[in-house]
């Protein structure tokens, strides 16, 4: 239950004024925005909140993310039976709005043109994979589901992965759009795994297995 003080506007205003995003929180936020996370803008248009939505099957991952943003989250996660999901939201804040202004255009998530300056850490890469990646037997690759970002967005991501992480990837088109694949045979999949493995929580390590792709995104 939310404490009464959390609904007190003066207390909340003072509480928010003391918040700032740590480097770790920024890195997790970046990976989350490339994956399943979304940002909701406030009524004022000057602040925004991060929303995390995942299947209840991945509750350990949800609670891990909440632990990262613990001072930003005043309640939840809340269970929604209709789609068997867990959702939590941060407080609205100008710091998160900065990421909204980068990753959204006309309320639609995009890839910023300066993504090379944003996606630079192995932690961000790992969170992106935990959100929207998996091993894909048919393509003998690790797959990053990037349908939402269109051709141009995928090209920006592909270049970023090469420049910042030394990863050569394939851009593959199917009936739904474009996705990024990190091939096994070239050795890039092994390189990718070494970059992210220390940041993958135990519950999500199954994603390295070669399986048919399973969509877990409940927010798009």
Model feature map: region roles:
Residues 1-220:
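Internal intein/HINT superfamily modules and their associated LAGLIDADG
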């Amino acid at each position: 239950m939310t404490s009464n003080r959390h609904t007190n506007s003066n207390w909340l205003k003072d509480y928010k004024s003391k918040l700032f995003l740590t480097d770790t929180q920024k890195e997790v936020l970046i990976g989350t925005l490339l994956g399943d996370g979304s940002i909701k803008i406030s009524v004022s248009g000057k602040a925004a909140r991060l929303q995390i939505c995942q299947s209840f099957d991945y509750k350990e991952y949800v609670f891990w993310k909440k632990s990262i943003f613990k001072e930003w989250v005043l309640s939840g996660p809340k269970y929604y039976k209709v789609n068997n999901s867990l959702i939590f939201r941060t407080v609205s804040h100008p710091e998160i709005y900065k990421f909204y202004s980068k990753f959204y255009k006309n309320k639609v998530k995009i890839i910023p043109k300066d993504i090379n300056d944003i996606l630079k850490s192995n932690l961000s890469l790992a969170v992106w994979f935990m959100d929207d990646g998996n091993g894909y037997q048919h393509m003998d690759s690790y797959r990053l589901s990037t349908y939402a970002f269109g051709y141009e967005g995928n090209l920006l991501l592909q270049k970023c992965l090469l420049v910042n992480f030394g990863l050569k990837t394939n851009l593959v088109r199917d009936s739904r759009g474009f996705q990024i694949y990190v091939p096994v045979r070239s050795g890039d999949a092994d390189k990718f795994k070494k970059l992210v493995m220390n940041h993958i929580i135990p519950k999500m390590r199954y994603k390295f297995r070669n399986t048919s792709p399973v969509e877990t995104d409940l927010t798009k």
